[in-house]
């Protein structure tokens, strides 16, 4: 079997799908994208495609190493996202050829279900509470919320109080009927993270995500030493080599590699194993589309330390398309009691509505994240 063609489709709301075709008619799908940089990743995919055309898709490990090592410069969000989507599609092909789901090819199930959680947008308490109520109606009881709006490098007590007030109102509205993590989104400087984490402790969040940017990872063990709240990070780390340094330094309790950013299934399975050796749990980052989610689920079901799975159903970014709009077998992604079950169809287990993908790709938006500024007009972290 040989790879004959690679096609990319930029899609709303901010996704990109990839299709790999073979000379035997077997097709694999992947989802390579960096939100806001889809065209750049697309170019990287087709650069890698120059080598991949004519290669045997079953040699996933060798193809991965070539894509990563054959270029003198390596790593980073663009290349690793391109590799990720290609890797997902190669696993999809392998599973279809062998008539088995990917998790079966990786040793079989380690669990029968995985807890799902949903991102809830909004910075005003009433908006967040309303969003939680809506999502509870479709079965969610675990959520992730903004931990704050933009904060200055050293900000005032009013800004801290505003962030804490939102969380306090949510806990008061729902008590312990729900669990929620708080996403600082890298918006918070190390000095302010120290203050804000302390103030939020009484509301017992499930975790605090990206308390500081990955570039400031040396602060993770320092922040962890001052709180009992688990710290989570990983969406802006792109290979096992990035995660190695964080695991060795300590401080992170929940690793969040993104299956569409961190080298795909092949690399993230290695990252999961590394985390397990350090007694660190896994909760793959996934505010993206259905192929990315499927890839995450296969890792969840073969990784002992996987504890939570993010997904984008109902997320406020989803303008123009919802999570399962391009999927034919929607029922396979249904949840029971807030849990996903294993996908059982061969490969990734996603049946893509290709005609709809082609149609929607004709007018795909170029999504960009907002540009925020502080009161003094300096750029703020979003």
From Swiss-Prot:
Enzyme Commission number(s): 4.2.1.6
Site (Transition state stabilizer): 310
Pfam families: MR_MLE_C (PF13378), MR_MLE_N (PF02746)
An example molecular function term from Gene Ontology annotations: galactonate dehydratase activity
Binding site for Mg(2+): 183, 209, 235
Cofactor(s) of this protein: Mg(2+)
Entry keyword set: Lyase, Magnesium, Metal-binding
Keyword Metal-binding in annotation: yes
Catalytic-site annotation from UniProt: 185, 285
Enzyme class: lyase
Cofactor, free-text remark: Binds 1 Mg(2+) ion per subunit.
Reactions performed catalytically: D-galactonate = 2-dehydro-3-deoxy-D-galactonate + H2O
Pathway: Carbohydrate acid metabolism; D-galactonate degradation; D-glyceraldehyde 3-phosphate and pyruvate from D-galactonate: step 1/3
SUPFAM superfamilies documented for this protein: Enolase C-terminal domain-like (SSF51604), Enolase N-terminal domain-like (SSF54826)
Site (Increases basicity of active site His): 258
GO biological process, one term: amino acid catabolic process
NCBIfam families associated with the record: PRK14017.1
Protein family according to the UniProt entry: Belongs to the mandelate racemase/muconate lactonizing enzyme family. GalD subfamily.
Other information: Reaction proceeds via an anti dehydration.
Role according to the record: Catalyzes the dehydration of D-galactonate to 2-keto-3-deoxy-D-galactonate.
Protein's name according to its UniProt entry: D-galactonate dehydratase
Gene: dgoD
